[in-house]
A protein has these predicted regions:
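A generic structural signal for short beta-strands and their flanking turns/coil linkers
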Residues: 23-25, 30, 38, 48, ...
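Hydrophobic beta-strand-centered segment that forms part of the acyl-chain substrate-binding groove
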Residues: 62-69, 73-120, 145
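Short, intrinsically disordered, mixed-charge
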Residues: 44-48, 80-87, 140
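Catalytic strand-loop segment that frames the active site of acyl-thioester-processing enzymes
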Residues: 2-69, 156
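HotDog/MaoC-like acyl-thioester-processing domains
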Residues: 1-22, 103-162
Length: 162
């Protein structure tokens, strides 16, 4: 048996740097069904105590089919940490520098969400670069419920200038 080396204990064996990414590269994130438990956990973590997010009868009395997801509950599904991007960039990621979103359709308890990120921007600097993603979340009916953008600052390999 080989000796244990913690530097080789990685989800993704090869690290990627700014120049390793390409426009159009797509990162599919795990799907998730918005169960009552997910709603309750998010409501508790967010501190949003509006009954539209946790009281089924309140929602039904207002003509809604069930609990309405908080917008950030849909947005959080696009967190790159749910996929492989942060594991690919453990050595090169400097920081998360920008995020924006538009909430296009309501998300209700029982909906299954399918998030994805696609690289749509690569802006090279001297020793770093910005990787921009378009983010989308679709529901089980194929409707886009969220679209947005995320930007990350990554190091270039060995700080080499382009």
């Amino acid at each position: 048996m080989t000796e244990f080396d913690p530097t080789r204990h990685r989800m993704v064996p090869e690290q990627r740097w700014f120049e390793d990414f390409r426009i159009g590269e797509r990162f599919v994130l795990p799907s998730r069904t918005m169960t009552d438990a997910v709603f309750l956990a998010f409501q508790a973590a967010s501190g949003d105590n509006h009954p539209i997010h946790y009281d089924v009868e309140f929602c039904k009395a207002r003509g809604l089919p069930g609990l309405l997801a908080h917008g950030l509950q849909s947005l959080v599904q696009t967190a790159p940490g749910a996929g492989l991007f942060p594991y690919m960039t453990e050595d090169s990621l400097v920081g998360f520098i920008e995020q924006s979103s538009r909430f296009l359709k309501p998300v209700f308890a029982g909906d299954t969400l399918y998030p994805a990120l696609e690289i749509d921007e690569l802006a090279s600097n001297r020793t770093t670069g910005v990787v921009g993603f378009s983010s989308t979340v679709h529901n089980q009916r194929g409707e886009c419920v969220l679209e947005g953008r995320q930007r990350y600052l990554l190091r270039r390999r060995n700080g080499v200038q382009a």
